[in-house]
């Protein structure tokens, strides 16, 4: 069990990380650069 907002933030970060890893690598600038 943990603080709800902490868990929500942690899960959101995990989802964003998975989303970023699913995108092709790019050396560009802007939202597509990770």
Curated annotation (Swiss-Prot):
Cellular component, GO annotation: extracellular region
Keywords carried by this UniProt record: Amidation, Disulfide bond
Transmembrane annotation, as ranges: none
Disulphide linkage map: 2-7
One Pfam family matching this protein: Calc_CGRP_IAPP
GO molecular function: hormone activity
Superkingdom of origin: Eukaryota
Keyword Disulfide bond: yes
Record PTM Phenylalanine amide, positions in chain: 34
Protein's UniProt keywords contain Disulfide bond: yes
Name of the protein: Calcitonin-like peptide 2
């Amino acid at each position: 069990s943990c603080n709800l907002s902490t868990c929500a933030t942690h899960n959101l970060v995990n989802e964003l990380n998975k989303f970023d890893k699913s995108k092709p690598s790019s050396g560009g600038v802007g939202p597509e650069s990770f």
